[in-house]
Amino acid sequence: MGEPATDAWTGPMAWTGPMVVLVGAPGAGKTTVGTQLARRWGVGFRDTDADIEAALGTTVADIFLDHGEEYFRLAERRAVAAALADHRGVLALGGGAVLDAENRTLLAGHRVVYLEVGVSDAVRRVGLARDRPLLVEGPRTRLAALLRARRPLYAEVATVVIDTAGHEPDEVTDLLAAALGPLLAGGSEPDEAADAAGGSEPDEAADAAGGSEPDEAADAAGGKR
């Protein structure tokens, strides 16, 4: 396997911050694909949900249960800021991180990949969702609402959009590596990379989602995952 990170990391346009940031709904495959991509490139993988759990000594589900969503979002904001500042590998954000306007601002200028997933695929992948506090009751209905609300926000922060429908994790990893290779090498523009990856354009994704305003999306989503 090639390692497109090497030249980009040491050359005249060496990048600061994560090589790539993955966003998407629960079931999009951020952790699985991110881990595979990091292994392929020989870099570290980091997940802000795992960072929060390590810092607070408990699970995300228990944080929601014991302290509420507002408390979790504050912890998440701090985790996102810290990871964007000091991680140099592949970074995955929690599904609801884009609800926070400060997080979206922090993502500007980073290579952000939106892993797009449909409701059926997401439900199949998350199962009973015991570790996802906002999906415990009626996961299909809840996921559909989350996707409607968050798609415009994912698209807003995305450099590249990759549709995961019909693809196994290793195939998504291949698409992601192909899309990011030119960007890491300082080559094609983000929209060209998105075309190469088979993903929709961020603006098109937002239009398809109905283009709701960020505040409306946050209200409709009601939480994290």
From Swiss-Prot:
Region (Disordered): 186-225
Residue positions binding substrate: D49, R73, G95, R150
Database matches in Pfam families: SKI
Reactions catalysed, as given in the entry: shikimate + ATP = 3-phosphoshikimate + ADP + H(+)
EC number: 2.7.1.71
Any one Gene Ontology molecular-function term assigned to this protein's record: ATP binding
Pathway(s) this gene product operates in, as recorded in its UniProt entry: Metabolic intermediate biosynthesis; chorismate biosynthesis; chorismate from D-erythrose 4-phosphate and phosphoenolpyruvate: step 5/7
Keyword Kinase included in the entry's annotation: yes
Superkingdom of origin organism: Bacteria
Cofactor names: Mg(2+)
Broadest EC class assigned to this enzyme: transferase
Binding-site positions, ATP: G27, A28, G29, K30, T31, T32, R132
One of the GO BP terms on file: chorismate biosynthetic process
CDD domains, alphabetized: SK (cd00464)
Protein residues bound to Mg(2+): T31
Details of cofactor binding: Binds 1 Mg(2+) ion per subunit.
Keywords, in A-Z order: Amino-acid biosynthesis, Aromatic amino acid biosynthesis, ATP-binding, Cytoplasm, Kinase, Magnesium, Metal-binding, Nucleotide-binding, Transferase
Assembly with partners or alone: Monomer.
Family that this chain belongs to: Belongs to the shikimate kinase family.
HAMAP family per UniProt: Shikimate_kinase (MF_00109)
Role description: Catalyzes the specific phosphorylation of the 3-hydroxyl group of shikimic acid using ATP as a cosubstrate.
Family matches, as PANTHER family: SHIKIMATE KINASE, SHIKIMATE KINASE 1, CHLOROPLASTIC
Name of the featured protein: Shikimate kinase
Source species of the chain: Frankia casuarinae (strain DSM 45818 / CECT 9043 / HFP020203 / CcI3)
This protein's encoding gene: aroK
